[in-house]
Amino acid sequence: MRRVERVEFSGLWDPEPGWLNTASYGLPPRPAWEALQAALSEWRVGAMSWEPWDESTTRSRESFARLVGADAADVFVGSTVSAALAPIATALPDGAKVLTDDVEFTSNVFPWKVHEDRGVEVVGVPGEELVAAIRPGIDLVAVSAVQSSTGVVLDLPAVIAASKEIGALVVIDGSQAVGWLPLTVDGIDALVVHTYKWLMSPRGATLGYLSPRLQELCRPSAAGWYAGADVHTSYYGTRMDLAPGARKFDQSPSWFCYVGAAPALELIEQIGVETIQQHNLALANEFRDGLGLPPSNSAIVSTSLAGAQEAFASAGIRAAVRDGKLRASFHLYTTPADVHQALAALKPLQ
């Protein structure tokens, strides 16, 4: 696999060497950083109105829709994954059964579990057993496209096919996937993504897709002025005229977050997700090879090598520890030098 040379993206990032932690927090590209600084400068002196900032929300919605093959009318905006999933969980009938991975990130678990008092049951199984566990009696499958702790990439077509066969809803957390892994909403009922990881945006911007089927099933229980058909006439009073489509599920956006998100998402479109995937996997697999691991289809590498966390810390390499294992992640601003530095730090442990 050809490595996409970083010179192709030169000038877009200014990372200090050794950042291997995009799975925790992505680094902003220069256009996103500059847009955010400009908005902050306007705010500081009062030289602004919120409407231009809100144009970034529309741009983010439209860019996300293009990235995942959705209609922008089926995309909603918010701030967190768990809040975005709450209306779906509320719409589940009493006694519904939800299937998930037993190491699923809790933002895609707790929204379902808080309904256990009305009989909703959440069942977790090992990831390799997930597809086989999709059988009659399961009402909804809630799982990540890429697992946060391990980097395992979901067999999404198999999950969709098995769920369709029994009529189960498919709800995907794409926070560790969208931005580097080609993914569309075909066959998915809901896709929710926080943008501060692989979409390299400020924390506080979440984008989601709701299928027309789910839009009919769910109630916009967090509706506010921003969910109005005309936000300017939705400020006051008891009259409610909600927006059509998924926009009725919009939560009032944190504008600064979307000011940074819009140029970051548009840059990903410009570079191309397939190109990003190629770049990320080349570096991740170079790292895996140095550890004596076989190649993988993930930009996240997890290793249980004893002492790895301490070795990284001593070498100034920033990564994460998840479920007792070192987790390294590789994105557009990662360089071959970062990989070599990481392998050199771990070599005495092998």
Predicted regions located by residue number:
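Pyridoxal 5′-phosphate
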Residues: 1-350
